[in-house]
A protein has these predicted regions:
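C-terminal peripheral helix-coil segments that are non-catalytic and often amphipathic
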Residues: 99-100, 140, 144-156, 170-218
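Amphipathic alpha-helical packing segments from all-alpha helical-bundle domains
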Residues: 78, 88, 110-114, 121-156, ...
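Helical hydrophobic small-molecule/effector-binding pocket
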Residues: 87-124, 144-147, 173-180, 184
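Helix-turn-helix
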Residues: 15, 23-65
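Short helix-coil transition/hinge motifs at the ends and kinks of transmembrane helices
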Residues: 81-82, 122-130, 186-199
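Hydrophobic alpha-helical connector segments
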Residues: 61, 75-108, 165-172, 202-205
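N-terminal intrinsically disordered/low-complexity leader segments
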Residues: 1-11
Length: 218
């Protein structure tokens, strides 16, 4: 029997994930079943289960694909070693977040939002899904790197926070979370608050950067 190449195996795996992605775009991700994915691929049940043994492994792979999209972790690492001012590096980190989030809105963000909500409500599913993910989550990593710059440069006296530093760091993380949530609801589900039209994620993140600089005394 001829040996199947690794390239072929990766192509079949990608084919199944692409099918799962399309199903998740049409219905709530947490309602997708392995049967849905088998039907979407046109493969046999065994042909799908050879690569993914349950829906949790599919979810984990989709989350990994989202976090690997665009190579943002590498971009963040490159920003962190630049010989530039702290505020310039922070601005680049926030800009990278803008671009990544904009790309996610037209691709994975609906799926990520639905799965994160599902995992919060179902701890067992959370363990089964996130226990299989391998890629570094982008936004927590970005927040960690931004925090490292802010903390270290506050310790040197470069930044002079106008309120306690822990409050600023909490503000940044909670603001990012709020922007991601509200823009996702607005653009993926057409939900908006009274008097509020379409939200612009780039303007919101840019405003967050400017607010952060003010809070840091710059």
């Amino acid at each position: 029997m001829p040996k199947v190449s690794e390239e072929y195996l990766q192509e079949k795996r990608k084919e199944i994930l692409d099918a799962a992605f399309e199903v998740c775009r049409r219905k709530p991700a947490y309602e997708v079943t392995m049967s849905d994915i088998v039907s979407e691929t046109g493969l046999s049940q065994g042909g799908v289960y050879k690569y993914f043994n349950n829906i949790y492994s599919v979810y984990a792979a989709l989350i990994d694909e989202a976090n690997l999209a665009g190579g943002l972790i590498h971009e963040i690492d490159c920003i962190m070693v630049l010989d530039e001012s702290p505020e310039a590096k922070l601005e680049k980190l926030f800009k990278a977040a803008e671009n990544f989030f904009s790309e996610m809105l037209i691709s994975y963000n609906k799926i990520l939002f639905e799965l994160s909500t599902y995992c919060i409500q179902n701890p067992d599913a959370d363990r089964k899904i996130n226990g299989q993910t391998k890629a570094v989550p982008v936004f927590p990593y970005l927040a960690k790197c931004a925090s490292e710059i802010i903390i270290s440069q506050t310790q040197t006296g470069y930044f002079k926070p106008v309120i306690p530093l822990p409050d600023i760091l909490t503000f940044i993380v909670s603001s990012f979370d709020g922007i991601i949530r509200d823009v996702t609801l607005n653009k993926c589900y057409n939900i908006s608050s009274d008097g509020m039209t379409e939200l612009d994620e780039k303007k919101l993140i840019s405003t967050l950067y400017l607010s952060t600089m003010k809070l840091l005394g710059n």
